[in-house]
Amino acid sequence: MAKKRVDKRGTRKPITKIKFLVEGITEKFYFKELLKFKEYSAHLDIDDIGGGGYFAFTREISKNKSLYDIVVIIADLDRAVIHFGEKEKLVELISLLEKLNIKNNIFLTYKNIETWQAATLPYKINDLSLELGYSGKSKGKEDIFQRLMDKGAEFEIGKRKFKLENLYYIKQGLEKGKFKEGNISKTQSNLIYFFEYLRDVLEAKIK
């Protein structure tokens, strides 16, 4: 007599899905491969907004908020310094993220993502595109993560080159973040606690 099949699907722990939103295609290529490398593939859902500034993130989240559980944004901070009105739009974006879900977060780098990528190398460089062997700017290069790895880049190296006290916006836990206005144009990146935050979000018990 055949054994009765037991459906164990109901006992499986659901996988927490995080929606990652980045500015452009280069960031998408880089973080997609980085997250795979760090074994976050099960939680990987990443899209770029095609530029457009902080309001483009706000528009995307507002339009699709019913589809998103947790949203993590990765963006450049120099826009808030250079362009009139962008700082206010950034603050509005952060307020929206916190209002929708305290697990949401934004990771900002000044000047931009290339600043972070260059910092992950074990030596100082002047031109990231040139160092990685690109004939033009490094924008839109599908293999940028691998080229960085081939040069000895490590996420942990980048973490050591930025200071927590230099951050403009700090949100390390599941509570509202804090602003330090005087830091907005300092070289910085809160990617220094990126994976620690993801771990805490995935292990969190709060809804």
Map each language-model feature to its residues:
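C-terminal accessory helical subdomains adjacent to catalytic cores in phosphodiester-
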Residues: 2-17, 28, 33-44, 58-72, ...
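Short hydrophobic beta-strand that contains or immediately precedes a catalytic carboxylate
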Residues: 19-23
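Short beta->alpha junction loops
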Residues: 44-53
